[in-house]
Amino acid sequence: MSLEVIEAQTGEQPVATVLILHGLGADGRDFVPVAEQLDLSSIGPIRFLFPNAPVIPVSINGGYQMPAWYDILGADITARQDEKGMRQTQDSMNQLIEREIERGIPARRIVIAGFSQGCAMALMTGLRFPERLAGIMGLSGYLPLAATLAAERSPANADVPVFLAHGTRDGVVPLPRAIASRDALTALGYPVDWHSYEMEHSVCAEEIADMHQWLLRVLA
């Protein structure tokens, strides 16, 4: 699956890459303003990648076609999951990461991040990627295909830093689902940096500040 990717660099010869996956119904432009608020100049020039999800029918929305990383089959997002669609997106994200490595950015200097559906795919991809990444950042999402993670997870990323953030009033991905995801990762030994905020299914200024500090740490 070939994806259109919006690319932005803060300077020539970037020293790290941050790959950010948008949520259901959005596109890559959605998180460009957030990235612009992340001053990582102390690390050096950064390349940001914002891929656009393919437009597919989404079952929970009556089959209406919209940008989505995978199909949502029902209101309970973990009861029935579109494993085929998730695996296809995982392959596409692997290809994007591998392309960055070919462009001269070591895997240890690459962060994969995402919001909502994008969070799910960032976790799915990053935890299974065969080379050690700098970190995984998940916003307002959940751990997909959790039952397969123990068998499929990458030994190289067994201790990869994970940033998870969620709104306490999220009506799209309820907070208990995010807490269950956090606890599942912690039980497997991942170092999870957990944050919750008084907000709905969105991003807030305090969260962006926490993302900034975490990125400075994992990319230092």
Explain the meaning of each model-derived region.
Residues 1-108:
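Serine-hydrolase catalytic machinery in alpha/beta-hydrolase-like enzymes
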Residues 22-24, 110-115, 167:
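Conserved alpha/beta-hydrolase "nucleophile elbow" surrounding the catalytic nucleophile
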Residues 31-36, 150, 174-184:
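Short alpha-helix in the alpha/beta-hydrolase fold that links the catalytic acid
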Residues 101, 106-157:
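Primarily recognizes the serine-hydrolase "nucleophile elbow" in alpha/beta-hydrolase
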Residues 164-166, 170:
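Short beta-strand/loop motif that positions the catalytic acidic residue
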Residues 176-220:
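C-terminal catalytic histidine-bearing segment of alpha/beta-hydrolase fold enzymes
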